[in-house]
Amino acid sequence: MLIHGLQKLTLLDYPGKVACTVFTGGCNFRCPFCHNASLVLRPDEGEHIPEEELFALLKKRQGVLEGVCITGGEPTLAFGLETLMARIKEMGYLVKLDTNGTRPKAVKRIIDAGLADMIAMDIKNSYEKYPETCGISGYDTAPIKESIQIIMSSGIDPMTFAP
C-alpha cells in the first residue's frame, strides 16, 4: 500500500493510546477546509514511505507504541488497506481507522474482519449542508447515513468529538 506520511509518535490521534499515524493519499471529497490538502489533491507528489519502513518502526517500538492510526486522505480508497491493517494487527497493535464514511461496504468489511479497534468517522456537517462542506455539488448523504449505522451497531468503539 502507498503510505504518504508517517508520524512516528502521537498522543492525540488515538485517544488514550501511544500510537503512530499512517497517512494515505487521495480522497473522494474536496473539502475547502481540508488540513491534508496536499495528500488529497496531489497524492503522487511528496513523500512515499515503503510499507517495510512502517513495519520496521512497529517492530522496533513494540512495548512502547500501543496502536496505529490510519488516516488520509480517505484510507478506504487505498489499495491494500485491509492487508496492511491485518499485518499491523498480527503484530499485536490496536488499529484506529479515520474515515469520511463514503464507503460503507469497505467500513463493514473492515469491521467484519476484525481489523479495526476504533473507528473515527468525520461527520462534516448537517446532511443539508454536506454538498457545500464536502465540495461536491448535490452530494447524496445516503452512504454517510449507512456508515453511521454500521459503525454504531458494530460494537467497535466509535470516536466522538464535538466542539
Where are the language model's segments positioned?
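Short, small-residue-enriched loops and turns at beta-alpha junctions
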Residues: 42, 74-76
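Fold-independent oxyanion-binding glycine-rich loops
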Residues: 6, 37, 73, 123
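Conserved AdoMet/S-adenosylmethionine-binding subsite of the radical SAM
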Residues: 55-67, 76-163
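SEC14/CRAL-TRIO lipid-binding/transfer domains and related phosphoinositide-recognition modules
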Residues: 2-7, 26, 40, 54
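Short, charged low-complexity linear segments at domain edges
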Residues: 1-17
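Canonical Radical SAM [4Fe-4S] cluster-binding loop centered on the CxxxCxxC motif
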Residues: 16-49
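A secondary-structure boundary/capping signal
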Residues: 23, 71-72
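Conserved alpha-helical substructure of the radical SAM core
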Residues: 37-68
